UniProtKB/Swiss-Prot annotation:
SUPFAM superfamilies: C-terminal domain of alpha and beta subunits of F1 ATP synthase, N-terminal domain of alpha and beta subunits of F1 ATP synthase, P-loop containing nucleoside triphosphate hydrolases. GO terms for cellular component: mitochondrial inner membrane; plasma membrane; proton-transporting ATP synthase complex. It comes from Sus scrofa. This is ATP synthase F(1) complex subunit alpha, mitochondrial. Expressed in heart (at protein level).
Length: 553
């Protein structure tokens, strides 16, 4: 009874003040010692089988609680939002993984739980599931391996052509370049659309908003711009090439499939990446897709190359973000959007930039698309994006149904920095066109009230009608800049003033065919020089005059 003797010796060794200890406490120490002795004696007498069963009992009774710093448990799940207890070390916008294999992103870091948005079907997650940190902020694969592919918002291939071969990854939420690495916009980004390249020119590194009601041709302008880059990407000059990223947000899958087919038919997919977060995808994926596409574009920008990104459209991204924010219990503001919805778009669009030569001289041009309701450009999201961008192309339903396509309202459309990037040849021929069209619109409003107009006003109306006809252009038929210059030259210099407006389109097609087949050297000179010299001017005048004489006859 060694254990009992030790306990008694300890009790006797206590000083007299230990008398204050109750008899119960002293008794309990003797009971504990006796139980320990009995347990040891029983273990000695038992066989191997009983020892293993006792050990099994102790193992099963062990504390199975997990480390709450790196993992957590789902408290509630619904509407694509999971509330998770634990994950104390998780970072904002860190990727987390659920036990079902689904990924999510931590957005709300609260004292007692973490709000996680789920990238996928939340029905695969149930309460009590374990969630673990990945330690990585959300990133996507980037590089030239993605060209010609269709990927989702996380960079996973969804075109059935196998996995993406890229080994380079980049965070989706990178900070925009500062002031020092940037340089002012100076190189043209040609869309191939006469009305845009002549009146609202876009430069490489610019952010130009395409805004209008549904079904007014917003996506058509974006697709024409991508198709027009084929003439540069087929060449060998890397400085002229423009890689394209098209981000489809909240669109129908059939629409995206149709778009990919159109680009494939035009042989434009070889220099294009399509990032798709369709209407059936979870709201967090629709929110994330523009940032993922932007990171893919930044890869080209930061490697001294040029890229164009189209966000179609940011209205749907804002709606997805509003849905997430309200479900995360963030306070709503105007139109129920959260207070940081301006920052949502500004931090995205500020990443489009023209870098200076010390930083590679690359560029990322952004063409965000915004859908308005009944032409209301004073709504919350349209005004936000208009204030962030460097100009806007405003499309009108009324013009669209009048047959003026692209339905660009020349008065409301503006490019704040693009004129510095416009080629000199286009500046020379289109310089007065915007003013003439503005005067035409002003006079046309009064002309319907009376017919007794002076000769100068009648001349203004006549010229305006013909220029409006001249700016019409078919879908998926972008034009080279030198072809645009030749056509606009004929209209602005007054050679078409006596031609019937209904014959303008026919004249344009015939004139272009004639110039391309008979005067290729002149077009090459305009393209190479980038300006119209006196010699070129005289040659153009001669060609237009001679062709018109034959055309009218």
């Amino acid at each position: 009874m060694l254990s009992v003797r030790v306990a008694a010796a300890v009790a006797r060794a206590l000083p007299r003040r230990a008398g204050l200890v109750s008899k119960n406490a002293l008794g309990s120490s003797f009971v504990a010692a006796r139980n320990l002795h009995a347990s040891n004696t029983r273990l000695q007498k038992t066989g191997t089988a009983e020892v293993s069963s006792i050990l099994e009992e102790r193992i099963l009774g062990a504390d199975t609680s997990v480390d709450l710093e790196e993992t957590g448990r789902v408290l509630s799940i619904g509407d694509g939002i999971a509330r998770v207890h634990g994950l104390r070390n998780v970072q904002a916008e860190e990727m987390v993984e659920f036990s079902s294999g689904l990924k999510g992103m931590s957005l709300n870091l609260e004292p007692d739980n973490v709000g996680v948005v789920v990238f996928g079907n939340d029905k695969l997650i149930k309460e009590g599931d374990i969630v673990k940190r990945t330690g990585a902020i959300v990133d996507v694969p980037v590089g030239e391996e993605l060209l010609g592919r269709v990927v989702d918002a996380l960079g996973n291939a969804i075109d059935g052509k196998g996995p993406i071969g890229s080994k380079t990854r980049r965070r989706v939420g990178l900070k925009a370049p500062g002031i020092i690495p940037r340089i002012s916009v100076r190189e043209p980004m040609q869309t191939g659309i006469k009305a845009v390249d002549s009146l609202v020119p876009i430069g490489r590194g610019q952010r130009e908003l395409i805004i209008g009601d549904r079904q007014t041709g917003k996506t058509s302008i974006a697709i024409d711009t991508i198709i027009n880059q084929k003439r540069f990407n087929d060449g060998t000059d890397e400085k002229k090439k423009l890689y394209c990223i098209y981000v489809a947000i909240g669109q129908k899958r059939s629409t995206v499939a149709q778009l990919v087919k159109r680009l494939t038919d035009a042989d434009a997919m070889k220099y294009t990446i399509v990032v798709s977060a369709t209407a059936s995808d979870a709201a967090p994926l629709q929110y994330l897709a523009p940032y993922s596409g932007c990171s893919m574009g930044e890869y080209f920008r930061d490697n001294g190359k040029h890229a164009l990104i189209i966000y179609d459209d940011l209205s749907k991204q804002a709606v997805a973000y509003r849905q997430m924010s309200l479900l995360l219990r963030r306070p709503p503001g105007r139109e129920a959007y959260p207070g940081d919805v301006f920052y949502l778009h500004s931090r995205l669009l500020e990443r489009a930039a023209k870098m200076n030569d010390a930083f590679g001289g690359g560029s990322l041009t952004a063409l965000p698309v915004i859908e308005t309701q009944a032409g209301d450009v004073s709504a919350y999201i349209p005004t936000n994006v208009i204030s962030i961008t460097d100009g806007q192309i405003f499309l009108e339903t009324e013009l669209f149904y009048k047959g003026i396509r692209p339905a660009i309202n020349v008065g409301l459309s503006v490019s704040r920095v693009g004129s510095a990037a416009q080629t000199r040849a286009m500046k020379q021929v289109a310089g007065t066109m915007k003013l003439e069209l503005a005067q035409y619109r002003e006079v046309a409003a009064f002309a319907q009230f009376g017919s007794d107009l002076d000769a100068a006003t009648q001349q203004l109306l006549s010229r305006g009608v013909r220029l409006t006809e001249l700016l019409k252009q078919g879908q998926y038929a972008p034009m080279a800049i030198e072809e645009q210059v030749a056509v606009i030259y004929a209209g602005v210099r007054g050679y078409l003033d006596k031609l019937e407006p209904s014959k303008i389109t026919k004249f344009e097609n015939a004139f272009l065919s004639h110039v391309i087949s008979q005067h290729q050297a002149l077009l090459g000179k305009i393209r190479a020089d980038g300006k119209i010299s006196e010699e070129t001017d005289a040659k153009l005048k001669e060609i237009v005059t001679n062709f018109l004489a034959g055309f009218e006859a």
